[in-house]
Amino acid sequence: METSKKLVIVAVLSITLILTYAYLISIIEGVDYFTALYFSVITITTTGYGDFTPKTFLGRTLTVVYLCVGVGIVMYLFSLIAEFIVEGKFEEFVRLKKMKNKIKTLKDHYIICGYGRLGKVVGEKFIEENIPFIAIDINEDVLKEEYEKYPDKFLYIVGDAKKEEVLKKAKIDKAKGLIATLPSDADNVFLTLTARELNPNILITAKADEKEAIRKLKIAGANRVVSPYLIGGLRMAEVSVRPGILDFLSTFIKIAKDEYEEDIELRKFVIEKDSELAYKSLKDANIRGKTGATILGIRREKEFCINPYPEFILKPGDVIYAFGTEENLKYLENLVKKKKKKL
């Protein structure tokens, strides 16, 4: 049991014992209650001024029992108080009290459920961008360690994030978003269901270890599902097989397909000498308007221009990198292949 809880229990027991003894002595010895209370306190603390002593046999017997039991309890109480102060428990108590007061005033904040490796990355990003959040984890040591790094920006609650009372402590009814990064997919599904029930409007982003869990988390109420293993695996495959400046884009487009069922593709198109687009500016070519595809960048020999300006002039040999739906990219392919009209 924590020192603070033991301190409260022993303190309540001591006060109850003092008041009860005072009441009994006032009746047995026939004195007023204040005098009896005064005698009760100086007796249990072994002060013993001697200005008042029980006169009856019953009063003296009760005092002997009171001394045997009460002195031990009070001495234990004093030792707990000393431990509470010396071990920094009092300082921690004050700190937690301040933290609870801060949490009570929060609104439009985020709740990170599970402060492991992934949750920690999310938290540090939020701290960097001054986004208010509360971290929830069952491991108090991990939370304390993080608090010591960011004492002014890190708020936390020790507990099981799947439980309603813990989420309510984190003010889920006033939260803007919840990040579910618990260890298992089953835990994240249960957490998502609970969070969605407590706040139907909250934005929930959940972690999925298995690909099959993505669908289940969405059914449970997650707005977005992220699979770290899927992202990491695709990224490693891309940089191994197709290393280059745009490999990461194809990775995330693949993720968009797998996780969000978005029909998006990334392709490259070469401008030929007789292409209608050759020697036209991007503004005049109006690729976006004609095809719906978005140009990410243009490679010219060894140089690469990301997000080129509208005044950029297309030349033969330029490689256009664009993304869009299959239909968008088909229109762009036809536009690139379209020949110039001969005069």
From Swiss-Prot:
Cytoplasmic side: 1-7, 83-343
Pfam families assigned: Ion_trans_2, TrkA_C, TrkA_N
InterPro entries tied to this protein: K_chnl_dom, NAD(P)-bd_dom_sf, RCK_C, RCK_C_sf, RCK_N, Trk_Ktr_HKT_K-transport
Stored PROSITE patterns: RCK_C, RCK_N
Keyword Transport in annotation: yes
Membrane topology: Multi-pass membrane protein
Motif (Selectivity filter): 46-51
Segments forming domain RCK N-terminal: 107-227
Domain RCK C-terminal: 253-338
Gene Ontology, cellular component aspect: plasma membrane
Keywords for the protein's UniProt record, in alphabetical order: Cell membrane, Ion channel, Ion transport, Membrane, Potassium, Potassium channel, Potassium transport, Transmembrane, Transmembrane helix, Transport
Bilayer-crossing regions: 8-28, 62-82
Topology, Extracellular side: 29-61
The name this protein goes by in its record: Probable potassium channel protein 2
Originating organism: Methanocaldococcus jannaschii (strain ATCC 43067 / DSM 2661 / JAL-1 / JCM 10045 / NBRC 100440)
